[in-house]
Amino acid sequence: IRLYHGSNTVIEHIDLSRSKRGKDFGQGFYLNANPDQAMEMAIRTARFMNEGQPTLSCFEFDETKADEMGLSIKVFPDYSEEWAEFVVMNRKNDSDIPAHSYDIVIGPIADDTVGVQIRRYIMGYLSVATLVEELKFKGDHAFQYFFGTPRAVEFLKRIEL
């Protein structure tokens, strides 16, 4: 499958140490199968960083080969309570120690504007079922691909657009 990473610069080599904590699936390298959604992220990143140009980097990923080679892959086929609790667990984690042991996680994107709802869930004011609805991405049904270990990153082959 062809995957895209949107940023303010071309990604030639993936450096997991540059990844930020507190993301949906943890600290790692994120990609999207939809180039339009990846470009939206590139625009946001360039605007937020106030430098560079919105840029897509493209990678080829063979999920079957990664699975055959024994990588630990978690797939959330749709929004679910398990997915919501996984997102909360990762967004709460502010340590360098990952909250899970998966090499790769594939699943829906959570809406970035719901930090308040996550806090309300943690405090017990929202049910997990309500949280699932609140976390649903408000655009097209979007999936993200998380690569969280050096071994996982080895399965991404950079290709020119």
Predicted regions and their residues:
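Ordered hydrophobic segments in well-structured contexts
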Residues: 1-5, 29-30, 56-58, 144-146
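N-terminal cationic and glycine-rich segments that engage phosphates or anionic surfaces
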Residues: 34
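Glycine-rich loop/turn
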Residues: 1-29, 37-47, 83
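Conserved NAD+-utilizing ADP-ribose enzyme module
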Residues: 23-24, 39-40, 44-161
